[in-house]
């Protein structure tokens, strides 16, 4: 192998895309698409889905809250 031949190949490879840029595009592109799609779905869900139903409050907790407020609990 000649030194000139090696220098010619290096010059030809240098004209191509930077490998770091390729890795950045391959990893960053899908990641960016994923994040944007998640945001779009989140906004869509906030507008169109009904609000969550609240969990039923237990009678024990209801009694405790009424005692805190000073309201007499019926049956006692």
Curated annotation (Swiss-Prot):
Residues 51-76 are annotated as: Disordered. InterPro entries: S1FA_DNA-bd. The keyword rRNA-binding does not apply. One of its GO terms (biological process) is regulation of DNA-templated transcription. A motif (Nuclear localization signal) lies at residues 50-55. DNA-binding protein that specifically recognizes a negative element (S1F) within the RPS1 promoter. This is DNA-binding protein S1FA1. The gene is S1FA1.
